[in-house]
Structure formats: structure tokens, C-alpha cells
Amino acid sequence: GSSSVPQDLQDEINKYGGKLKQTWGVPVEEIQRGIKHGVRKINIDTDNRMAMTGQIRKVLKDNPEEFDPRKYLKPAMEAMAKLCKQRLQEFNTAGQASKIKKVLTTAEMARRYSKGELDPKIA
């Protein structure tokens, strides 16, 4: 699945000195429709990077003397977290973490491989 590439995030990046060319993604409504029809992989990385970049540019434009990464990375991380929360709600996945099956640790996998428990079974 494709990112939505929100216009407001493009505008924010460009407002604070970015030079992103006009681009489009898949609207959230279309992604939601795809989910209802079986799409199970949704990309939001581009949206996350745009949210972070916009905040970093804003902080540095508003505070050109700033050089402490904590001063611009904190609002950038907050913007990304806000976007992720929004997408989890829009895609009806908020509150589903308890349904994720436990993943084996690498140490447990190594133990099970060495005992042959994970050997392929040919019928």
C-alpha cells in the first residue's frame, strides 16, 4: 500500500524552507476502502518522515541559533507519534496490540533449531 502524502505536511515543509515538488499519494479514504477489501499492508513511512521534517524545519526556522538535536527531535517525534495515532484510528487498528502473537526471541529460536523442533517436515 502507498502512503497518503498529506498536502498539509507538504505545505508545512515548504513553508519552512523545504522545496518539495507537488506530489500526491493515496487518500486516506481510498486506503480505508482498500482495507475493507482485504489490503493488509499499509505504508505510512513517507507520511511519518514528512511530519518529522516539517517540525524540524519549523523549529530551526523559528530558532536559527538552535543546535541541540533534543530541541528539534522532540517535536519531530511528537508529530510522528500524533500521525501514527491518527492513522491507527483511521485504519481501525488502534487497541489491537494484544492480538499480536508473541514472537520467539533469537535465543529461543536458536534453542529450538538446535533441538530440531523447527526442522522442515516433509509429508
Residue ranges and their predicted role:
Residues V26-A123:
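C-terminal alpha-helical cap/extension of soluble enzyme domains
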Residues G1-H37, I42-D45:
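Catalytic alpha/beta core domains of metabolic enzymes, predominantly
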